[in-house]
């Protein structure tokens, strides 16, 4: 432990992020490290793609909110291991919540009238497996809109593959 607080380290990171904006016409994306990935627990590759994704949705001016919401969503979901596709679920839900002015306190009530992103529906349906701690049940019900989640390993639902037949087709 260095003894440095994240806020203290964040100051120069924020400064240099602003400086880089002045030279963005020469830039092709995130080229420097940032403490944000530690503060918000956003995987590096996803962080690099997050700003363009947020900007493409017209939320560029709310990027800081999206990063804060990423951390909030991560906590709401029980801090799942963030690898593709689960990191996408956290990011998609964070963007969705900012886009719709949702909070952890109002998402269940207001979410009843909203269509959630496909990745979030797939996650809560169990298509990426089930977290050991389970899903937040009230949120799962709102996201699935009456659809039943699966309770088995998702691969078990796939039809068997006839490799001999596939070999003939290829």
Predicted regions and their residues:
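Active-site-adjacent C-terminal substructures of enzyme catalytic domains
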Residues: 18, 22
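Phosphate/diphosphate-binding loops
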Residues: 2-16
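Terminal or standalone catalytic/regulatory effector modules within metabolic enzymes
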Residues: 30-37, 41-170
């Amino acid at each position: 432990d260095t003894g440095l607080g994240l806020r203290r380290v964040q100051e120069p990171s924020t400064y240099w992020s602003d400086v880089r904006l002045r030279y963005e016409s020469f830039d092709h994306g995130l080229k420097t490290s940032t403490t944000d990935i530690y503060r918000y627990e956003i995987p590096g590759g996803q962080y690099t793609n997050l700003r363009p994704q947020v900007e493409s949705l017209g939320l560029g001016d709310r990027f800081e909110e999206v990063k804060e919401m990423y951390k909030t969503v991560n906590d709401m979901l029980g801090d799942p291991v963030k690898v593709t596709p689960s990191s996408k679920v956290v990011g998609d839900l964070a963007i969705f919540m900012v886009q719709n002015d949702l909070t952890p306190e109002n998402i269940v009530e207001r979410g009843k009238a909203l269509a959630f992103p496909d990745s979030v529906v797939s996650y809560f349906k169990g298509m990426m497996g089930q977290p050991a701690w389970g899903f937040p049940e009230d949120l799962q019900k709102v996201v699935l809109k009456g659809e039943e989640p699966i309770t088995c390993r998702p691969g078990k639902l796939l039809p068997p593959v006839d490799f001999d037949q596939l070999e003939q087709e290829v």
